[in-house]
């Protein structure tokens, strides 16, 4: 184990706890560090799913959220191989990003956004992000060579393009992704549109006002984004739509616990302009009470 870890206990990040136990996570992190050492990577620190290493010109980061989800899905005898393959692939094009940040006209085709929990890394302020869903981050990334590169602010400024313009371009690219939209009837009464894709359903939901007007009801939309690849949207047209939340929450929970790329168990209201959070209360008996935002409650009861 590296010297800095001898003084600091490895803890499972909260957003990994439904995937992996404490002892297995310690094994996982140590395997990652040993593989990186064998590859000649100069690791500086580890914290909360983020391995910081000494790069050519500045410190770099390996975020473990995708790797840990792949790791737990393979047989134990193949887990170390999964780690080796992952980090070897990251070493194959170490200088490609230097070129991308020097040629915006070429790089812009790879711009995308991902929706992520706010605790994805303790150093998230170093990266280009914005907030669309309350309590979540919209993160600007390069989708290049079958991996996502989280774009740091010091990298993005090399393009000399306003950050909001970068997000606009990224969302145009997201609109070109192949996202399947299925219409289901929940509780024999409520229309629910389910967005399915490998990586970009949650990101695609940000385009609801321009690409999914059919999913917007008189009172807006009820949205759940349990994982990056699965989104639930109900067009709110009646004042009894809260009857849907129990069934919807249970369905979201199933995806959240089974899918390797979970995001949130919160529900959101798209009010035809912005996204707002439904209230959630944990009761003493272990149940959860979900209630409408005050603004929504007012308009549906008029």
Please place each PLM-identified region on the residue numbering.
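N-terminal alpha-helical "arm" segments
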Residues: 1-45
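Short glycine-rich, basic-tinged beta-strand/loop micro-motifs
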Residues: 10-15, 50-51, 190, 225-235
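Conserved catalytic core of nucleotide polymerization and phosphodiester-bond processing enzymes
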Residues: 19, 23, 50, 274
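Well-ordered, non-membrane alpha-helical segments in soluble/globular domains
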Residues: 24-29, 201-213, 241-253
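Charged, alpha-helical interface segments at or near domain boundaries
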Residues: 31-35, 39, 44-198
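Short beta-strand
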Residues: 43-46, 222-226
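Aromatic/basic-lined ligand-recognition segments
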Residues: 179, 189-215, 219
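C-terminal structured domains
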Residues: 227-302
């Amino acid at each position: 184990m590296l010297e800095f870890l001898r003084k600091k206990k490895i803890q499972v990040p909260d957003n990994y706890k439904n995937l992996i136990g404490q002892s297995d996570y310690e094994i996982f992190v140590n395997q990652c560090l040993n593989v990186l050492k064998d590859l000649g990577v100069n690791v500086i620190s580890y914290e909360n799913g983020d391995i910081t290493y000494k790069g050519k010109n500045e410190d770099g980061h390996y975020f473990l959220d995708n790797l840990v989800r792949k790791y737990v899905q393979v047989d134990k005898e193949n887990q170390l191989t999964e780690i080796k393959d992952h980090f070897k692939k990251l070493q194959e094009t170490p200088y490609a990003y230097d070129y991308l940040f020097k040629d915006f006209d070429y790089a812009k085709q790879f711009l995308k956004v991902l929706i992520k929990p706010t605790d994805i890394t303790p150093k998230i302020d170093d990266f280009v992000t914005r907030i669309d869903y309350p309590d979540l981050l919209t993160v600007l990334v390069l989708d290049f060579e079958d991996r996502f590169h989280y774009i740091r602010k010091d990298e993005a400024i090399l393009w000399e393009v306003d950050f909001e313009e970068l997000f606009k371009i990224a969302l145009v690219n997201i609109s070109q992704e192949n996202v399947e939209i299925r219409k289901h009837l929940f509780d024999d009464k409520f229309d629910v549109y389910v967005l399915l894709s490998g990586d970009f359903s949650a990101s695609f939901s940000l385009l609801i006002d321009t690409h999914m007007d059919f999913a917007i009801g008189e009172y807006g939309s009820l949205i759940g984004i349990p994982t990056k690849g699965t989104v639930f949207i109900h067009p709110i047209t009646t004042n009894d739509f809260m009857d849907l939340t129990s069934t919807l929450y249970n369905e979201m929970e199933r995806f959240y616990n089974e899918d390797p790329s979970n995001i949130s168990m919160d529900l959101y209201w798209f009010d035809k302009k912005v996204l707002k959070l439904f209230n959630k209360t944990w009761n003493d008996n272990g149940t959860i009470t979900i209630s409408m935002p005050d603004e929504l409650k007012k308009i549906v009861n008029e």
